[in-house]
Amino acid sequence: MDLHPVALDTPVTTYDPSRPTPAAIVSGHIAAHDAPHPLSVFDMFRIGIGPSSSHTVGPMRAGLAFTTELAPLPPPSHITIDLFGSLGATGRGHSTDRAVLLGLAGYDPETVDIETVESILPSLASSSMLTLPSGTQVPLSIAEDVRFVPRTVLPYHVNALTITASDKDGTVILERTYYSVGGGFVMIQTNDDPHNPEVSSLATSQAGVGIDVPAPHPFASGAQLLAACDASGLSIAELVRHNEEAVRPRETVNAYLDRIADTMFDCVDAGTSATGILPGGLDVPRRARALAGKLARRLLGPSTPTTAETGQGVPDDARAWVSTATDPMRAMDWVNLFALAVNEENAAGHRVVTAPTNGAAGVIPAVLGYLVTHCPETGSTPGIAAGPDTRDGSIAPLSHIRLTGRPVDSTPEGSELADGAAAHEHRRTLVHEFLLAATAIGALIKTNASIAGAEVGCQGEVGSASAMAAAGLAQALGGSPQQVENAAEIAMEHSLGLTCDPVAGLVQVPCIERNAIAAVKAINAARMALWGDGRHTVSLDVVIETMR
């Protein structure tokens, strides 16, 4: 394995103050109506590691940017990291220190392997040496050189960090201040005035490509989005696709949508196969695997024995509240499972999709999982014993629904998923429509309010994810633009006031369960909207403004 996969000339740290970028739009540095192109699906959904997009992914990108800029300069003898404000307050619980160090070592949150993530702090603790991508080893004490400064809040943003590299005489070689503004987006300070900072945004290898290319259907509000759909005759998903394909070839867009969906499905399956206690000191046990096993066996009760021949439960302690194989509410159990699995993976610091944040990473995969396993529009067969196909004995509930890397005929004989290339392609199309419609809603929230829990509370994280998921599901089930907007509005409206209140600063309690609740809320919001005609009293724009 290449320990430092990021080449020193990778242009991940280039920035141009005159060029609009997603980070500049998200941070409010550039007004949404001044941006020629709405935020892209490449901006809204990004692969990274847990547990926080603003406190883990963003700082890791900052560390990578710093080490890349440092590469052509004289080798440093000392590096210090100062974590200010919210990063200082919850940085230990959110693994901010580990994230910055991973970035400085040359790792990207999208590609770093989990073994490296888990080994870097023990390695530093034993050696007190940080190896830069160039191979230079720099003495670094985690206790002394990574400083948490929660009571100092820098003027530009509550999530700030400063990295300083100096020579053996203490002369500064390079010093940079970064601001993690939410969703993994990062701004860099370009002047030395601490009271009046000037900032620009970091570019990345994917996000921001074409943000300054005029979109064929620009929109900066929900009203403008609906007007653009009316004028063009396009659905919200089709309109977003047209904007995407003005910048990138269709094949590139589709490949990215496939990758995002498959990473979500893989995360669900990883969470359902993992056991143990989540890190951080709260001793929170993983629950997804046990729940997956019960649902896969079609249990009729919480502790029901099964027969080897049929896998069906024989109830010995059945209770009225226990969902059975004939209970239509059983679908909710699967949705809960999907969300719990993803957020347990996130809490463990493993691979997730930022959607739109890591703290809310379980909502959209849970609703997407519901779409592909319980909705007949995607070829699933709801009804008695409805749920993912687990007749091969696996408790990885989405292992047969990946969009890529799975031959169509690889599903078990008799499975409702063994339905040929045409059905597979239809399912893929609906998944793409889901993600594209969710992108539109997420872009509106990001540009007109905030998705950072440190700024607006959990209403901006889980609330936004619920709105995006509701819109995506309504779109995939055939909703009109007005119904899709209504679904997002319902989910967002009934998330207003939700605070960011993690116990001990960990993205575990109440965050993991909260994702499950928000996923079910999103499904209900979509169904309510689809039973209506799209007309409603409070607009999505008003709800977003209220949240801000």
Regions found by a protein language model. Name each.
Residues 61, 337, 341, 362-372, ...:
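Contiguous, well-ordered alpha-helical segments that form the cores/surfaces of helical PPI scaffolds
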Residues 251-379, 420-453, 457:
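Accessory "access/gating" subregions that flank catalytic or transport cores
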Residues 83, 471-548:
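Functionally critical mobile loop/hinge segments
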Residues 2-19, 30-42, 57-60, 65, ...:
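Structured, active/binding-site neighborhoods that engage oxygen-rich ligands
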Residues 8-27, 304-316, 377-425:
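Intrinsically disordered, low-complexity terminal tails and inter-domain linkers enriched
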Residues 109-321, 334:
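C-terminal regulatory domains involved in ligand/effector binding and gene-expression control
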Residues 45-65, 349-367, 458-467:
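Conserved phosphate/anionic-ligand binding catalytic regions in large, soluble enzymes, centered on
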Residues 54-69, 365-377, 424, 471-478:
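Alpha-helical support elements that line or immediately flank enzyme active sites
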